[in-house]
Amino acid sequence: MFEKNTKPLICTTVKGDNADGFIAKMAELREQGTDAFLLRLEYLLPENRTEETFRKIVAGAQGYPTYATDYRRFDKYANEDDECKAEALLAAARAGVDLLDVPGNMFTNETFELTHDPIAVAKQRKLIDEIHALGKKVLMSTHVDWYLTQQEVLDIAQAQQERGADVLKIVTMSNTAKELTDNLETTRVLNETMTSSILFLSSGDMCRLHRMAGPYLGCCMWLATFEAGRKDQPLLSDLKPMLEKFENC
């Protein structure tokens, strides 16, 4: 799962403030045809961010592949430092989550999500090694709210790969037709250049085609949502039948 050169998965976001909320939503999404779950652990109430809770959530996934985040920037409680978040990722790995998201700026206060601070990079490498020792995989993520050139994307991906990431996630912008077509080409080049799996996405006014076509050019998954009104992520209930029709036409 999430391997390079294997069939891409439809991975759908799941949120909740407790295990029961996650489990109920996963049951709905299984009925709609998801292949995997993106577990947004940062939405859990602080008292529910425990290995016991994570085990309940993983059990509720019923064997479907799981990918988990604990993003500081989306944590509305904002009461955990990165050392705590590292412990949460390790607890999630012990609980059985398959793929853990390590942000590229973890262990720093930097806003750009790829630090080159040597102390922080050493901590990231150590965390990645610890997750690997538990038999799990690591995705390293870098999100920006501007357009990145192909060379900038390749440089970020190379740094993520050198730190030990199994999946290289980079999110840029597609606000014009030129940016969109550049990003499609960059997806192909990334897949041909990197040995790790890739998840290269964009947001912005013209991002939808990149999101939809990326897995046909090498991305390891489609990201879907259950929340209507998002331009950057399609509803699972729309995406699943559309892909089936496209692949059978």
Indicate residue ranges for each PLM-predicted region:
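Active-site beta->alpha loop and helix N-cap motifs at the rims of alpha/beta catalytic domains
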Residues: 2-133, 137-139, 145-150
